[in-house]
From Swiss-Prot:
Quaternary assembly: Interacts with SDF2 and MED37A/BIP1.
Cross-referenced InterPro entries: DnaJ_C, DnaJ_domain, DnaJ_domain_CS, DNJA1/2-like, HSP40/DnaJ_pept-bd, J_dom_sf
Listed GO CC annotations: cytosol; endoplasmic reticulum; endoplasmic reticulum lumen
Lineage start: Eukaryota, Viridiplantae, Streptophyta, Embryophyta, Tracheophyta
Gene3D superfamilies linked to this entry: DnaJ domain (1.10.287.110), Urease metallochaperone UreE, N-terminal domain (2.60.260.20)
Residue stretches making up the J domain: 26-91
The protein, known as: DnaJ protein ERDJ3B
């Protein structure tokens, strides 16, 4: 059953303003668009993200609800020309002052969240976006630390791309076609079509560089992508492609990841293997995990620690931790030691 908007909006509006401020992310980062994004870019980015994180598609998922609140809050500001200008110049504090002085405010104080979504999807129905001609997507392999994938984090990545700039003169484009006839022989004519336009200005490509903040969400797996809509390669008379960061887990000194599970090796002495031991270690977020044993531990024995693996993406659940115990045997024994061991096990 779909979540009721009247109940949902109370929760989302209560969260929406504080979320972006506390997280330290800009509204452009939230919508995954560059600061110079056009109104159409912002609308399309909002549409895609709202479809992805809509509560009806993620029921019971608190993380998706939080993201949906962020997205709506950011869109309310960036879709309003006056609010966006104030935000660009003065940031969050400027929006607060604007609201305090009788302006429409930002962060949940103007539009109704249901109105925002309904303007795109007709009262909440989630239709797929129509296809448009786009430039090439740019895919970047991004190594994320296991710590960031366990707790969530962000990375700043330097990005250079082609940007379309004005240039002198005019250019041929797809605005309109002109049909004319050419004589190719006695009584024979060929109909020709030519793309012409005397209104479109010429353009050129220039390279520009800037930093992109990539959010690493808890539980993301290898191959998952963080997309920045229309921040890929530009194309004349069309929309730019997308910039996509494809996640790869960086090697870790202690853990090996297998989906939602973690694996690690722990060395113990022969005495510890026989009589038991007390051991613990600090996990990726520094909480202590007790792996002690009171019984006999066999070489290569594997013990499972439930809920000590990786968090599942968009879930409060976690995978498991599997610890393989390596028993360190002594390289040699004295005759006296051998005698005592025989006496013990006789």
């Amino acid at each position: 059953m779909a979540i009721r908007w009247s109940e949902l909006c109370i929760v989302l509006f209560a969260l929406s303003y504080a979320i972006c401020v506390l997280a330290g992310k800009s509204y452009y980062d939230v919508l995954q668009v560059p600061k110079g994004a056009s109104d159409e870019q912002i609308k399309r980015a909002y549409r895609k993200l709202a479809l992805k994180y809509h509560p009806d598609k993620n029921q019971g998922n608190e993380e998706a609800t939080r993201k949906f609140a962020e997205i709506n809050n950011a869109y309310e500001v960036l879709s309003d020309e006056e609010k966006r200008e104030i935000y660009n110049k003065y940031g969050e504090e400027g929006l607060k002052q604007f609201s305090a002085n009788g302006g429409r405010g930002g962060g949940g104080g103007g539009m109704n969240m249901q109105d925002i979504f309904s303007s795109f999807f007709g009262g909440g129905s989630m239709e797929e976006e129509e296809k448009v001609v786009k430039g090439d997507d740019v895919i970047v392999e991004l190594e994320a630390t296991l710590e960031d994938l366990y707790m969530g984090g962000s990375m700043k990545v330097w990005r250079e791309k082609n940007v379309i700039k004005p240039a002198p003169g005019k250019r041929k484009c797809n605005c309109r076609n002109e049909v004319y006839h050419r004589q190719i022989g006695p009584g024979m004519f060929q109909q020709m079509t030519e793309q012409v336009c005397d209104k479109c200005p010429n353009v050129k490509y220039e390279r520009e560089g800037y930093f992109v903040t990539v959010d690493i969400e808890k539980g993301m797996k290898d191959g998952e992508e963080v997309s920045f809509y229309e921040d890929g390669e530009p194309i004349l008379d069309g929309d730019p492609g997308d910039l996509k960061f494809r996640i790869r887990t960086a090697p870790h000194a202690r853990f090996r990841r297998d989906g939602n599970d973690l694996h690690m090796n722990v060395n113990i002495t022969l005495v510890e293997a026989l009589v038991g031991f007390e051991k613990s270690f600090k996990h990726l977020d520094d909480h202590e995990v007790d792996i002690s044993s009171k019984g006999i531990t066999k070489p290569k024995e594997v013990k499972k620690f439930k809920g000590e693996g990786m968090p599942l993406h968009y879930s409060t659940k976690k995978g498991n931790l599997f610890v393989t115990f390596e028993v360190l045997f002594p390289s040699s024994l004295t005759d006296d030691q051998k005698k005592k061991i025989k006496e013990v096990f006789a």
